[in-house]
Amino acid sequence: MNIVGVWEVRADSAPFAYHVMVFHSDGTMLQSNPDHGNRVTSDSNGMGTWHANGSTVSGAFLEFTVDRTTPDSICRGVVQFEFTLHDNEFHGSASAMFYDLDGTPRRGPLTTDLTGRRFDARTYSIPAASSS
């Protein structure tokens, strides 16, 4: 089993449940979701590392958040995750902690269940462009 690739991920308890995660073969990963999915903060993309032990994948990513109403309120978020890979799906959980830039905890831990499905462009049909 191999986690490397692009995944559609649902984190039910997150401010916006739908995410895209990319796992690279060098043990790095990326996480992204729509900026305005979270109405309270603007969040950067998440960037982190992962490792596998059999079918169990664990890791963490870093993101920065800024309060939409008080732009001077900046936090560093660290999201840890662990899930079990089953072919082209995974199930597990994540926990997020948010800190001031000096390292003082501000929020968390915030937990959520994770489910993921491998993205394969061959399984999606894209409508042909109209020739008007």
Q: Where do the language-model regions lie?
A:
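N-terminal glycine/threonine-rich, aromatic-flanked beta-hairpin/loop signature
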Residues: F16-S58, E63-D67
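Edge beta-strand at a domain terminus
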Residues: G54, A96-S132
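Tryptophan-anchored aromatic micro-motifs
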Residues: M1-F16, G46-G48
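Short beta-strand segments enriched in hydrophobic/aromatic residues
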Residues: A11, E63-T65, A96
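Acidic, glycine-rich flexible loop segments
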Residues: F61-E89
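Hydrophobic/aromatic beta-strand elements that line small-molecule binding cavities or substrate pockets
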Residues: H19-V22, G46-A52, R76-L85, S95-A96, ...
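Acidic surface patches and DE-rich sequence motifs
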Residues: A11, H24, D100
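Short, cysteine-centered beta-strand-loop-beta hairpins and adjacent loop/turn segments enriched
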Residues: G37-T41, V66-S73, F98-G108
